[in-house]
């Protein structure tokens, strides 16, 4: 718990992103000090409600403290208007570099443009801000490779032909959801074409199953039908609805493309209690602590480990290079609909029960005491 009074109300409740300054009148004059940021880096993350972003906050704080910088980290709580207000707040503090994970890639374009107009270098972090030339750099995991790793896991576990395949995706407002699904489709489509899998829960995907490459519009058609909106309850409700209309023949031993760990757990909970489901293989992403426990317990099959420490360090590397007047290292580029954004990409690792200790415990990412049932 934190004691809050007039002396720290701004730091505790506004700077943390819990509220915005616009929610109140007569805030103390300390609400936007332009000198408070050493290194002049501001960070805007999308929500505190997903463990992944709380992890990122912690890693940023630790890494920047170790590097001798202070940082202001604000959360937008899934609200593009609050996101814009957060960016404007940081601009008034005199930041020179903005690291931002957009809630909605298109909607964040206005915030990026405002930062750019103020002379701020904009680094899109993990999710790409779309349809604007105001993005300078993109720091990300190889999102297509994430989807390919998820799909390859399903392929490797499948035997014979005629295996039921259930498809789920992230939020249609998130460019990464398109990249994840694109990567998965790269691997799954040939195995759908040869009969290894058949699609159960998406008529849009069935209509396009003979196409090896999908346009953005075609991806949008599929994602619009199978979106979880990155939300646990939405994912569980959708999975339950799919199972309600599925035949017994569409159950048995099933294969499930789930886009991330939160949705994977939700979908696993739904499939796990259906008496007609004999077994399921379900993918995930982010190596959230709860999903690691699910993997240990045999309730989630795998996760794609995206070491936040690496991504945070890459973002800081780009930010520091900018602050020191250097050109940051990049390894590729992503088209955001307006320009090709120079990108620094981090590697991903497939984790399941066979390597969970080596990948996540021995690496120091988690402690063995965080889990039960480890061998």
Name the predicted role of every residue range:
Residues 1-375:
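A residue-level marker of the well-folded mature domains of exported/periplasmic proteins
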